[in-house]
Every structure is written in C-alpha cells, then in structure tokens.
Amino acid sequence: MKQWLLLCAAALLSTSVLAETAEEKGLRLAQEADARDAGFGDHVADMQMILRNRAGDESVRQIRIRVLEVQGDGDKSLSLFDEPADIKGTAMLTYSHGLEPDDQWLYLPALKRVKRIASRNKSGPFMGSEFAYEDLGSQEVEKYSYRYLRDEPCADGLQCWVMERTPAYEYSGYSRQVVWLDQAEYRPIKTDFYDRKGDHLKTLVWSGYQEYAGRYWRADEMFMENHQTGKSTLLKWSNYRFKTGLDDGDFNKNALARLR
C-alpha cells in the first residue's frame, strides 16, 4: 500500500510539473534563483570598471562596493569611486525595491552635493558606462513578469534554462530581457536587453563564477556590450568578503559626502 501511495504521489507531482505554464515555470525559476542567494547578510568587494569606445580606447575606474541584504525589501548598495582622480569621492547609493521605484542618490564631489536620481532617468547610463542606473539595483523577483522559453546548452558546457522577463515597473528603458540561467546552480550566464522599440540593445555576460561562504556564487567578470553604439563595459570583481558587519548606518544618504 505504501509503495502504491508513493507511486501515486510521484505521478501527481509529475503531472503538476507537466501542467505548468510557461509563465509559471519562468516565475518558479526566478524565485528559486532568488532563494538560493538569500541569507548572505552583507558583502564588500573591489571592482575595476573598464570602459571601451567604438575605436577600442579604454578608460579605467576603481570602485569599492558595499551591499546590505534587507529582509522584506530589496538590497541596499553603495559604490565608492577611488580612481581616476577627477571622479575620486563620487558615490552612488541605491535602495532597491520590488515594484516601487528604487531610491538612488549620487554624490558628486565637484559639485559638493547629493543628487537624487529621478525614476524617469533610471534608464540613463551610469557614469558613462553601458550599465544603466536600473541595471545596478538588486534584481527583485517582483520587478518582472516571466515566461520560460526553452532549454539549451550555454557557456562552459553548462545546460541553461532560457526565459524572458518583462519589466513590471514604470520607466524601464527595456521592453523585455532574455535570460540564460544555468541549471546546475541557478546562476545568470547571459542576458539580452531589448529597448523600448523592441530592438536588441545590449548583452551582458557573466563569467568566472566563484563560490563564497559555502553557497553564494559571484562572477569574477561581467561584460556588457552595446550593439547599437559599439561601446562596452567590463566589470572585474575581486576581494569579496561576506558578513562583515555592515548595517543600515553604513548606507545613509546624509553621509555620502563624508565617506572615505
């Protein structure tokens, strides 16, 4: 009897999965990816940002990153620019949310003032890079609707789920995004971004994943290519440290001008 019940349960589960719609599967995959990264608390890292124009000329920026996990809301993040000298001291603070607009502030030392980034401007480029302001907030599940597309091989011999996500928040610069998520660890491998007209705008590729604190995966490099301008931005990450003791006081917009 017990074996028969187990077989029935397995059959019901299989039927449930098979009956799953493309939208339900896409949402489930996004939720699982989010759940696997929950509980990191906080982390700090160093980042090198390399900007390349169409001719291949480069400019390099050195940035320190701090991130705080927030229960029941999006993460808080702080970017502090150390180089080059002409932008040293620039800082960007982000409070990410679900469907509510992210709160973002930019401190510009040359002007000695903190500038709030308006919701309508989140699709603009961050500090001349190919990353938009909206790319830099934490990617809360609620920000998008999802649709599973297919399975296919992806980078480094991995197998990926491919899904489409459509921004559910106002003023996004994207009509949709197509995401490749690896089936081993639910890590993003590639994202294609489509502009408001539906044209292919950019591609972001993650590579060199490392595991930290026994379960948290972070990419060593993130390469964003703009197919419409020929420009690109490479982010190179290093010196990750988790659970360093950061708290809300380390993410205060009123202290941006005093940060070092």
Task: Tell what function each PLM region has.
Residues 19-20, 24, 142-158:
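Long, terminal "pre-/pro-" and other extracytoplasmic accessory regions
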Residues 21-110:
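N-terminal mature ectodomain segment of secretory-pathway/periplasmic proteins
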Residues 259-260:
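Short, solvent-exposed mixed-charge patches
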